[in-house]
């Protein structure tokens, strides 16, 4: 109140009532915030994909087309060193390296599943190509890397190369390899399974100098314009991943291919072992029981998967021996005590890992949710030899109905 002359002014302040947000309004607000964050994440991810696409086939980049594969491979080593990824690759990743023509992805998937079943922490898997989303190439503990982690690693790799190192981005697959090393390093990967992209000797994944174990899956004629037009030449390129004093395993090969692998083994100075084959009834190739009373029912269909699963078993055993993994070694020793005469020891953890293996797009059956009469049979192949087992798998399922 204030007096002015003969008038008295009275000021009345009306305080607003405290605003009360209804619980439903709070939920709606939080949902809107989440939707906004998700939309932003999707937009950021799409931007990454657009930038990544520029590295395909030298698109929008001034890269000389006459740079040899050897020179590109040497340069990639420089990227690994300059990005400070060498220590992780050689010391922390405990890599399993797999080359071959047929069954590389399936073999790697079997390895991943068996390792996870044996409680190995932070198992990384680098494969190619992807089926739907590029993040499928970077699996951590059986799942594709998250979009947020992908985005962070992508921009770190790209900006470090361009802005700090003042170097050009490598082409698509090589860039993805560097990106993968960053992703797996940040995830604290303790075992990194590397699937060769093409060939072996000059493949980006062959930047690893000290893997724990290497392998060559079934060989055939593929990429003859790059690798050579005979099985001997192709086998020689695939065997380029062999390392001195690192045990190498191979699936059974035709004599011509085996001769090249043996020759490379002598040149490098390593041991080469043909993987012993397990039968789906739980026996090895000599009829000895491999552990457990139940049959080994592989998670991937097709009789040819026995070859890939057998190779994966050998790789995991050798990996455990080289890394001194107590859990796996204990399982193997326990099984040996139960079956001292068995030549091929297959603990229950290995059997369960083989059974749980999943690899989208490989002998996969998808039934339409909206139609009971529509079923999709999915498989992939890039050579005539690879198409044959896929066709046999499809025929077996259809004829069984």
Residue ranges of model-derived segments:
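Conserved beta-strand/loop subsegment of P-loop NTPase cores
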Residues: 213-217, 245-250
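N-terminal leader/targeting and accessory segments in enzymes
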Residues: 15-102, 106-119, 247-249, 256
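Nucleotide phosphate-binding/pyrophosphate-handling subdomain across enzymes
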Residues: 191-194, 203-215, 219-220, 233, ...
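Hydrophobic beta-strand scaffold residues
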Residues: 123, 248, 271-273
